[in-house]
């Protein structure tokens, strides 16, 4: 509710340590088999959710492992490292030159053997292509989740609202808009959970009469990112011809690697 997602045509993306995509629906459904939807704060709704467990944690991982020089350069320019990297990737074409990343640095509950994968390296790729591929991989996986949830619910989402620390980046929000082919809205703060908690408190004290009333007074759209249709077509080709097949093709390999990593041979 902190991002005003109380209508079934809207979904909330959290670009946090764990990256999630959450819907708000009247009719209960499981976003994945045996994975229940959360009860929503409004009593008559549910919040089915799809998550990438190591979501924007991967940004911190990349910076720690590959961006020591970039941190020095960013400090000299007087900008934070994330803004510095945004500037480095904003002109890289959609698809990162054919570099595709499956963002399972830690597996989810439903696929405990899953692992991260990067495919498509060529000699022209740089660490900045990898950085962009991380963001694209997270967005493609969340898009995959939305496709599955829309199919299971017969609900169509046509607006996205972004929160979490990663939403502070306009480059991240534009990539998300281009992947999903939907407008991505930001509100006045990326700390949308805090806004939602405050709403509940104000409603309980009678300051606002309903969630709609609280949203009207407390949630203010800051800006919106409109999809670049050419980029969206590129991402849909990547999703349809490559990304959507990765998990099933890699499953037997991941099973062995999990066995290997836990002491087997």
For the regions a language model picked out, list residue spans one by one.
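Glycine/Thr-rich phosphate-binding loops that ligate phosphate moieties of nucleotide
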Residues: 23-265
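Conserved phosphate-binding catalytic cores of ATP/NTP-utilizing and phosphoryl-transfer enzymes
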Residues: 1-10
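Acyl-thioester C-C bond-transforming condensing/cleaving domain
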Residues: 10-12, 21
């Amino acid at each position: 509710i902190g991002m005003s997602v109380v209508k079934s045509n809207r979904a909330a993306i959290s670009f946090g340590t764990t990256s999630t995509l959450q819907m708000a629906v009247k009719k209960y459904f499981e976003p994945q088999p045996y994975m229940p939807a959360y009860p929503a704060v409004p009593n008559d709704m549910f919040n089915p959710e799809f998550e990438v467990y190591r979501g924007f944690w991967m940004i911190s991982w990349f910076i720690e492992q590959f961006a020591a020089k970039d941190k020095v350069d960013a400090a000299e320019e007087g900008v934070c490292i994330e803004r510095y990297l945004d500037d480095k990737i904003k002109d890289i074409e959609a698809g990162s030159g054919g570099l595709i990343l499956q963002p399972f640095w830690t597996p989810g509950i439903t696929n405990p053997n899953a692992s991260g994968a990067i495919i498509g390296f060529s000699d022209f790729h740089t660490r900045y292509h990898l950085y962009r591929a991380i963001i694209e991989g997270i967005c493609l996986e969340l898009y995959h989740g939305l496709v599955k949830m829309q199919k299971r619910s017969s609900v169509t989402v046509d607006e996205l609202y972004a929160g979490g620390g990663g939403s502070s980046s306009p480059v991240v929000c534009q990539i998300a808009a281009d992947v999903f082919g939907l407008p991505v809205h930001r509100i006045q703060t990326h700390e949308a959970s805090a806004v939602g908690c405050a709403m509940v408190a104000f409603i309980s004290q009678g300051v606002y009469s309903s969630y709609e009333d609280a949203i009207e007074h407390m949630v203010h759209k800051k800006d919106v990112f409109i999809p670049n249709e050419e980029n969206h077509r590129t991402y849909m080709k990547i999703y349809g011809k490559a990304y959507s097949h990765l998990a099933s093709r890699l499953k037997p390999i991941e099973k062995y690697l999990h066995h290997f990593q836990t002491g087997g041979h």
